[in-house]
């Protein structure tokens, strides 16, 4: 049974198990030994991080663990998560590591790993690494300890890769863009790329202090960017999260468009151009029913997966699809990247604005969403509220309330101690009734 790894690596509150310096040291040694055993390659690892205060602590602890098993460590500094996947392949490394808790607040942090192909590790690999963390590993002899050095141009190399994914010669002249970098990993890279492409850039969320990542800004708080778009008379807003693997778009009126709308736009365009591989989009069970209907009307399939961009990527690789993502804003374009890339997806949206000549408000409403309601219930460590008979009964009753006119989804979050209760239904009264009844039952089970 997996105890350390969730749906996106290891994550938790800094200085609380499992996110302690001691555990990071042990994880570094275990993953180093695993790749010394498996890769038989250059024994090289790249490490990136976002702007959290605890990132320095975990960077040093992981580096020590990795070097102790003979891995040579290349430190990239603050870079977006997709840059780590890129640099792992570009530098022919055996392993890539990103230190980030993505959209979570500053007190949290996490560690996620990429294999030599730039893709996240498999469940099987993570389970084996967990076993090695528990049992301990053999360290390298003194003369075989790994070397450590910094790589100064990682963000520039990433920026060039992002720009190369766009239509050759594309420029954003005349486009006024608010870009919210969430005080995170892309706080320098995103404004620079937009400026290089000719946009009139209004940067916000670009003053990280180690504690303000995702605080009142970024993709999980688009209100800040929405207000900035309206105040500056901008044409569009691009909101990233702390590690820049998510994107949310704001139109010129201040309206927010999630990942479903962005995926709908890109899928329809790619299908029209004959470059949507497999004739389908890959998305998770959280994507809106309206997206499914929109795609179906255009002869485009929808492949649904469990929640988590890693499962989207796995299905894309299995089925030969090249476009996928999540409602939360992870957009995966596998022709250009191995994981969700918020900045790249945002730039492709801007490219569609320039190509079509349409305002952002026209492009962000590709379909009318079916009313959707999502509520979360927090639980304590060791609790299993979904196993309670009262909760199971409430779920059955809620499904009866919807009676085939909508859908109900209840799941445990893979990154936080939350039970997520989501439903969709055209009848908003039934929708609210169904969700609230389950939320109440789960909350009662937590308090029991």
UniProtKB/Swiss-Prot annotation:
It is an enzyme of class 5 (isomerase). It comes from the Bacteria. The modification Phosphoserine is found at residue 102. It catalyses: alpha-D-glucosamine 1-phosphate = D-glucosamine 6-phosphate. The active site is at 102 (phosphoserine intermediate). Keywords: Isomerase, Magnesium, Metal-binding, Phosphoprotein. The keyword Magnesium applies. InterPro entries: A-D-PHexomutase_a/b/a-I, A-D-PHexomutase_a/b/a-I/II/III, A-D-PHexomutase_a/b/a-II, A-D-PHexomutase_a/b/a-III, A-D-PHexomutase_C, A-D-PHexomutase_C_sf, Alpha-D-phosphohexomutase_SF, GlmM_bact. Activated by phosphorylation. One of its GO terms (cellular component) is cytosol. GO terms for molecular function: magnesium ion binding; phosphoglucosamine mutase activity; phosphomannomutase activity. Pfam families: PGM_PMM_I (PF02878), PGM_PMM_II (PF02879), PGM_PMM_III (PF02880), PGM_PMM_IV (PF00408). Signal peptide: none annotated. One of its GO terms (biological process) is peptidoglycan biosynthetic process. The keyword Isomerase applies. Belongs to the phosphohexose mutase family. Catalyzes the conversion of glucosamine-6-phosphate to glucosamine-1-phosphate. This is Phosphoglucosamine mutase. It comes from Ruegeria pomeroyi (strain ATCC 700808 / DSM 15171 / DSS-3) (Silicibacter pomeroyi). The lineage of its organism: Bacteria, Pseudomonadati, Pseudomonadota, Alphaproteobacteria, Rhodobacterales. The gene is glmM.
